[in-house]
């Protein structure tokens, strides 16, 4: 299914409003397995809209028009589509009844013939009721092309799409199912290089890499009629990915909204283990992140933030074990970030020292970070710390 979105309204072309409807509809179409190939904007002009429809009807089999359904003279969308299809405009009974109720409850408002235009649909259309306004939308198929008319105001468009249009589209379309794999410790360019053969031959399912702060995600997507059918394809693609060059070693979790700290929080809760933290050079960011991830779960025993050490070594081995014992936690994490004197504001050279104390002993890791701003480096230091803890749990 090739779709084209046409935004109707001179105010879009003059920059008076931003076309947020295109973003919303593109996202929803993708979820339904509908490929949006074109975004078009056209002013409130019948001739230019007719020309736009002529082009769209030849290159797309779904044309979605947004805007131009109001009561004023420049609201021409339904009238122009009717002309293009060689049909008349007719009144929809439900939309007309809603208009009657609207004016009956507002005796001070004058009802004019223009108001009634909002209750019209193209003859032969399936009406799309508007839960958030008066202008009715519609959907009609002709010559192999489905035309959909939606209102311009985003609140009305979203309500009509969700409540009136989505159930109709879901009946006839394969949906897009996605799975997100999260990786830490490997860059996007390296990941893409390792997966070059998979990326080059992809059709359905597909995969797309996205670089995040300090990590990379892979979105796996497929069109299917059910979650079970989608899982068969996504499972195979995931297996192909993780067997490449030890990529399984970098994979840590699923999910668009997941993170390293959330993964640590989940594992702490699953194992019913507590952790105490002492940090230097991160400004308490570790403790703030874990507190947020755990919410009201009792697995963060507490912690402290210490100032500059004033020594060459950044190891906080004693501090990690002391805070573990002091707060009676299962784990004691100590993180120290030492900034080298030659660093600048936008080119920070640093060493990160990680220490994790447990009842059975102490493990440590040292990491060099360079070339980042101080704010970005703090985030990376925290990510390294959470990955260190994750690999221990």
Swiss-Prot record:
CDD domains: cinA
SUPFAM superfamilies in UniProt: CinA-like, Molybdenum cofactor biosynthesis proteins
SMART domains on file: MoCF_biosynth (SM00852)
Annotated family: Belongs to the CinA family.
PANTHER family linked to this entry: NICOTINAMIDE-NUCLEOTIDE AMIDOHYDROLASE PNCC, NMN AMIDOHYDROLASE-LIKE PROTEIN YFAY
HAMAP family in the cross-refs: CinA_B (MF_00226_B)
Name of the protein described by the UniProt record: Putative competence-damage inducible protein
Gene that specifies this protein: cinA
